Amino acid sequence: MLIGFAAAPAAAANAGVELPYDRGDMTFIDDGDVFKVCDTKADGHGVTGTLRGINHLTGKIVNLKSWDDGGDSGCDGGNYDVRGNSAHDMVLCWHGGGPCKVSRVFKENE
């Protein structure tokens, strides 16, 4: 499956993406460069959230970091230093199948 970047209007640096049917969500909090991935439905399937960016040498989209959540209480995640004017997005996938959801493109300096 090919998922690409799409232009987005300028907005606050915090960003998020949600799966349908309340299956899960992924959030970026600019203050501290914190990413949080939450499996929000007790359906036996977890979720994976992936941070992506552009490789400026090749122009290709690359996966920078992934976090999984499911089967435990609370959310998972961690820190990743999102820098300057580089475009990023997040992809959230449910382990039960179906299409992944992609966040808006965001930059730290928005």
Locate each region found by the language model.
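Secretory targeting and sorting signals
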Residues: M1-A12
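Post-signal peptide N-terminal regions of Sec-secreted extracellular proteins
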Residues: A11-E110
